[in-house]
Regions:
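Catalytic cores of secreted/periplasmic lytic hydrolases that degrade extracellular macromolecules
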Residues: 1-91, 95-211
Length: 211
């Protein structure tokens, strides 16, 4: 008599078990999706930062390039190093973004006395070993080139009380000597002024424009 074959049947999985499995499956998918979404967000943020820095650097290079021709002409005519002119313009105008530079083309913070050709603005001065805010009367120019020319002529003609005040700046043959002379000759009150100029000149290789 032939034996009956035993049938193998799958045991029914309780509904609760299926729900648990589905819960963990969906949860895993959500975790993975969230991870990749976060990664994409981080990548996008990093790229945005890189793009912003690149745009800022491009603007700064464009600012330098725009001033170079006039600055080099002033060096040829009056002996003021182009690298010094560029570094001062960058530092004094914050890359051409200051109100004085944007609205009045005064790149160097040069002051004046004639109300018809000047504008009163708030400025910071280093007095008695501390920074203070004061009102200053600054010259207004028609364009940046006019500001650069006036800057060079200031070194040539000096001040009303001392025509030779900036003679050592013009006589300097290298940017470090010229930067130090600006401090000793009284151009700026900031005790760190020379070092700030030197840093800008070296960081942006501004000596390449000296002729």
């Amino acid at each position: 008599m032939a034996k009956k074959r035993r049938r193998f049947t799958l045991k029914k999985v309780p509904l609760a078990a299926w729900l648990v499995i589905a819960f963990f499956a969906v949860g895993s998918m959500l975790v993975v999706s969230s991870y990749w979404s976060q990664r994409q967000s981080e990548v996008s943020q990093r790229q945005a930062i890189v793009d912003k820095k690149a745009a800022e650097k491009a603007k700064k290079k464009a600012f330098i390039k725009r001033l170079v021709p006039t600055a080099q002409t002033m060096q040829q005519q009056y002996g003021v190093l182009t690298s010094i002119t560029l570094a001062q313009a960058i530092l004094e105008s914050d890359w051409g973004t200051s109100t004085l530079a944007k609205d009045y083309h005064n790149l160097f913070g040069i002051k004046g006395t004639d109300p018809a050709t000047t504008k009163v603005l708030r400025t910071k001065e280093y007095v008695n070993d501390k920074w203070i805010t004061v009102d200053g009367r600054f010259r207004v120019y028609s364009d940046d080139a006019a500001s650069i020319r006036d800057h060079a002529l200031l070194f040539v003609n000096g001040t009303d009380w001392n025509p030779q005040q900036y003679a050592t700046v013009r006589a300097a043959k290298d940017y470090k000597t010229a930067a130090s002379a600006l401090q000793t000759d009284g151009y700026a009150t900031d005790p760190d002024y020379p070092q700030k100029l030197i840093h800008l000149i070296e960081a942006w290789n501004l000596t390449q424009y000296d002729n």
